[in-house]
């Protein structure tokens, strides 16, 4: 009994000592910052992070070591945040959330000071101030009454600030929140999300405030992430909201320079670009009958490269462009060495991303015998001699015409063994990460709008696959207008691809709840469709194409996050089975939502004759359950609002904001430190704990065949494409890398029904 009493007294003294230490640490931090108002945040942290490894004593000790006598109050708060960041480890990952709360306190303090100085006392006051300062587009106040804006202000939930980790909140604060002309923050995180929601809901004629709330909720709960341009530019005067643009470069001097101008304008307003150079004549080709005088594609690569450097994306990042060339183009060998470190530097372009378009025939021949000859042609010469453009075909018809060209002695050929071409491709890929791969036959077979054109290439991140055609000048006339002489050009706009992206954060969503998923997908589809109406287009050709097709790119992030929190290992059949169901459910919900929007607002211009209208889309993918058959009938009668729906982008920066894993990739590491402008930032796998630690496996340690198999399963449910990264180590041989490329073709070429049977 005496022993029990002694132990009981010991526990009492221990708890008393712990309380004393907590009060001491609390007092030490408050004194160190010189700010009594921080006490509430610190007490919340003590309550929400009760583990002894998150004791404020550790924070106080680290903070004290950073403090210097001559620090300002702002510098002391920054030191406190830094202390929490540096306490973050894979054993104590929640310090990153504590750091985020302290960072948010610091941000809120600055915002309060800014608001008081500007006489801002309500959300409407803030919007009026931002509009008057030219930081907000005047269309928000023109579209909503003061009463509506104050009602919308009631939707804001500051508690959702706690969802952020430090990396996400820090990135959001530095790159996405609106700042004053003196670079001070003037907008909170929740105000940013509400401002975006107000903008996205503007086209709604009925229940508009309800849609504002729905858009705000899915954004602020981090259930979805909009593309970087939408996050950065929605609600602003220049509201360019689209990420991806693709141009078909014609084989003419005027056309090439027009494409360069298009790229410059897209980059100026924050868009990334894909450029198809497969129509441009090769080096040594003829020009106006003069033999051997064409400079080829590589000379133009230098201009594209310099444009990317000269015209950055609103000062936020360097211009970004992927340049595509067909694997049968005569300039391919030089093209494959654009970014390598050896060779003539005058033939290099280190700031662009080369990409190659492959027909199935190339990979089949590579699999059968690497010593076979592959023949390269000049596209202009084929057009001149044969009367057709080889790049305008795919599948069996392309193969027949390719062999026709091979056997035509009138055509000059550049012949190489497939082994030599593959060696160039893989060496460049291992050294530089490029060229990107675009399997054109697979893409065109799955194109639901093949009745209106062909897909030559993809965008910067290889997830967009839509009909393409060149912009052409029809005529140039000299006219008189109001007494002045003017030059009038008539231009055929072609199909200048533009796509509006957003991603479902799978790690934050109730994937098993079919009803909730349908509602959230439908909300996001509506938001993306509204982007088409609201967008500020950098060039008119993009606006024309976007309104014809109304294409969107609904994708996914947090893929590995979603698997880990469910205890599903990447290298498992359970992974494939689970994600097969998830993406089928997402696809069903997206198609149903687009069809309902078509009923409400009208179908896209080219719906008639599409695979959507004929039902071929559903038959090709083996969607034959009663639910799918009923949806196919509904789509055929109601129409589709959007020609293209699903596309999976890599989502690197927006995934950081949402505190989840990037795209559909495995995590790089469970924990690592990343250097950013002299600071070391912790990167922690989402929801890292004893339960998820062994579920997360580094991308470089993962068997890449599982990633390829998973991509094949997902592709059944995606009408466009997906960005797939392969993580290759120095231990890989070139043969092993080639086998992965061949495996990609195996898991995407068969019909979906064959895929399901053989999985």
Explain the meaning of each model-derived region.
Residues 29-33, 184-187, 206, 210, ...:
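Alpha-helix capping and helix-loop boundary segments enriched in small/acidic/polar residues
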Residues 114-203, 280, 289-303, 313-319, ...:
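Conserved, charged catalytic cores of large soluble enzymes
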Residues 98-102, 106, 749, 753, ...:
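Terminal amphipathic helices with adjacent charged low-complexity linkers/tails
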Residues 2-3, 7-16, 747-754:
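Conserved small/polar residues in nucleotide/adenosyl-binding loops
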Residues 148-151, 162-170, 465, 528-533, ...:
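Catalytic alpha/beta core of large soluble enzyme barrels
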Residues 178, 196-208, 216-242, 246-289, ...:
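Function-dense linear segments that define catalytic or interfacial modules
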Residues 17-35, 47-194, 210-216:
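Core nucleic-acid recognition elements
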Residues 260, 520-543, 551, 569-651, ...:
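Internal maturation/activation junctions in enzymes
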